Amino acid sequence: MKIIKVTVVYALPKIQYICQVDIALGSTVKDAILESNLLNLTNDVSFHHNRIGIYNKTVHLKFKIKDGDRIEIYRNLTIDPKEWRRNNVFLSKKLKKIY
C-alpha cells in the first residue's frame, strides 16, 4: 500500500492548525481530516457546518486526495460581505462629514 503526504489546515484569527498527515493512497478528504485529529483539537470544526476545499477549490468529503494536497477547512462567515461593505460605506460617509 502506497503512503501519501497531505496537509490539513484550519485557521482562526489568532491561531492556525496545520497538520501533516501520512495516509494511504486512495483515501478521501474525510479520512485525512479524521487522521489529522483536528476535530478533537477544536470545537469549531464540524463536517456538517464547515466547507472543505483543496487549494481554495471546494470539494466533497468523499473526494479522493492526491500526494501533496492541502486540505483546507473553511470557517463560517461572521458577517455577510454585502452588509460589511454597506456598513463600511456608511461609516466612511459619516467620517467625511465630521472632518
UniProtKB/Swiss-Prot annotation:
This is Protein RnfH. The gene is rnfH. Belongs to the UPF0125 (RnfH) family. InterPro entries: Mopterin_synth/thiamin_S_b (IPR016155), RnfH (IPR005346), RnfH_sf (IPR037021). It comes from Buchnera aphidicola subsp. Acyrthosiphon pisum (strain Tuc7). HAMAP family: UPF0125_RnfH. NCBIfam families: PRK01777.1 (NF002490). It holds the Pfam family Ub-RnfH.
